[in-house]
Amino acid sequence: MSKSLGNDDLRLAAPALRAFTRIASAWSLTAHEQSAILGRPVDVACSQLEAGATDSDWPETLQRISFVLGIYAALQTLFPDQQQADGWIRRPNAGAPFKGEPALALMCTGELGDLEIVREYLDGQGMYQPS
């Protein structure tokens, strides 16, 4: 069933999706990784926004983008070198939630809560404290 986001949400959705695609490019995410993180194929999301018709899953999509933005911002704060910041999600991580796997593996499970775990991990490590 399709429904439109509210005007405010719709105005936020397009720039949020653009920010997501820029981050995905910086992280060299594949189309499959982008879809897993976003919870839907990016091209479908773009088409829906262009048509002004969104489905009931859009609030979750915006929440996913919010977590990605937070993860990205935290990494930019932690690592002064852009390559280090962008590469962190692909490096094996001994932190408890990752079990030796890269953060990207957890981010790509398709579960909203796993994106939240990565964001909270960075916040909890004192790596980033949002203002």
Spell out what each predicted region is.
Residues 1-131:
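Non-transmembrane "mature" sequence context
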